[in-house]
Amino acid sequence: MSTRIQRSRTRASALLASALLATGAAQAQQYINLPGTQPGGLAEGPPLENARSCGVTCHYSRDATMPSAMPYDGWSSSMMGNAMRDPLFLAALTIAEQDLPGSGDYCLRCHTPPGFVGGRTRSSAAASRGADLESADLDGVTCDSCHRMTETANLGNAQYVLSPTETRFGPYATINSIRHPGAASTWLADSRMCATCHEITNPAQPLLRADGTDTGQRYPIDTTYSEWSRSDYAVAGSPVAATCQDCHMPRIGAPGYSATNTTAMMRDNPRRHDFAGANAWGLRVLAAMRNDVTTGDFYDPEAVPFYEAGAARAEATLRSAVTLELRSAPTQADPGAPVEVVARITNRSGHRVPSGYTDGRRVWLEVALVDSSNRATVVSGAYDAAEAHLDETDPQLKLYEAVPGRVGVGREEHIALHNTTIRDTRLPPRGYRPLPGHEPVGADYSGGEGGALRHWDDARYTITLPATARGPVTVRVRARFQVTTREYVEFLARENRTDDRGRELLRRYEASGRAAPYDMAEATAVIMVGAPLPEDAGTVRDGGGADGAVVPAAASGGCSCHTAGDQPSARGGAGALFFALAAALSARRRRARRNDA
């Protein structure tokens, strides 16, 4: 699979001379021409159908409270179904078009296949930032965008090939439709199909190392597919083998469902069209837009519950992506003493964490001390919610992110001009062997099985206990995810010289909690401060500790399908606290009895 990606990238590079000739902002429109169905390519056949027509006539239940096999239910409230309404994407699109006129057309190949194939992304100078799109084009990755797609050897970079006929492809050979013929296709169940829009490089920019050395690759924008294809998740027979569809289009898990509301054919265990990812915040922004009468034909308060359900599914996906455990922590310590704590975060997803469009996305570990009154003092990974600011000056901060930039310039957010990776500390998936030039930068994940990168990271902290602390103190570690940062949003607003998209994004950002971090996983351990534990108090273990240390910890996060020896402790923070208090009380009673004797 990686060979096909390489061939596809080589072909794309060969087209550069006629595609993009310079990177100056004053140049004329220059479009990226790649294989696949071209603008006007369906002129001899039916155009891509309006997605709302698919939903209203056949594939919509209007019930957000139940698991639904109706494709429109999940799709319409997914980021795929709103790929041309996402305020963050639109703001970034305008900046890209300012920096490299014509580059927006390349983005729109994925974000609105109907608009691109319909010829409405090149029809004027402003078209490549979406100025000439029709209302139906705003539905993003529509039903026909996938269900008329045919297999191609050109993976990635939106090089899709669409059927010029009325036939819709799906998993079933027999359908009962009064609107269109159908045919079975294995392509829709193949992860290579997902590479179409989730393996994206910039044909206009090389990928350079920090010293300016050319890697021979193009600059990566979204490499989720190759992260998967070069991991154990893509290996048949692997204990973790799974396709993109297995995770992001889960099966309902029950018989007797129909994907239509007309002449239904019942299917057993069909797939949902939720396409749940990591962007719960984006879906809640879109829900607010659905409830805003100023958004025109997008205004639909009845659709809001579907977006809230989609956001909840995204949060569930985040919780399944990593596990967190305290591998080492002392069971007792003196007030004011420094203690050593080791936390392990493990990637349980089939790609890097975080993945996808990485500008602004990040995961970090927050470490806090929690006293018996449940007052928390953050000692590493502090996030100021009032300012939407993460303290990156913290010397112990564990931050997992990809930072783009330009050779000779450094870190910057002009996506169309990126040509180097300043930092890439994202967690690899299990068994990951990256493409040349895609290795971690600023982090060492060597030591995985069989020469692969490790899919976990051990974070070591030195924490000084409060001098006034007495009794049980809980060490709490949380893995926190943020889909975008204040700095990135403000950049998109500040640099916009063309339209109001940046300011509109900033307004929506301020009104929606500023993309507050979401806690993916948590682990805790209790330290008795100022009084030793009795010898017969017992211990609580959670997977052991470094150098045989006792670990009274509770771990959370990750999928529910744990293997033996990989189970989170059943004792949560409250249980561990109760245990510690009971042990201390028992010791006090024994001392009292000895004194009475």
Give the residues covered by each predicted segment.
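N-terminal module-boundary/linker segments of secreted carbohydrate-active enzymes
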Residues: 29-65
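Sec/Tat signal peptide C-region and signal peptidase I cleavage site
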Residues: 24-28
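Bacterial N-terminal signal peptides
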Residues: 13-23, 578-584
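Cytoplasmic C-terminal tails of single-pass
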Residues: 593-597
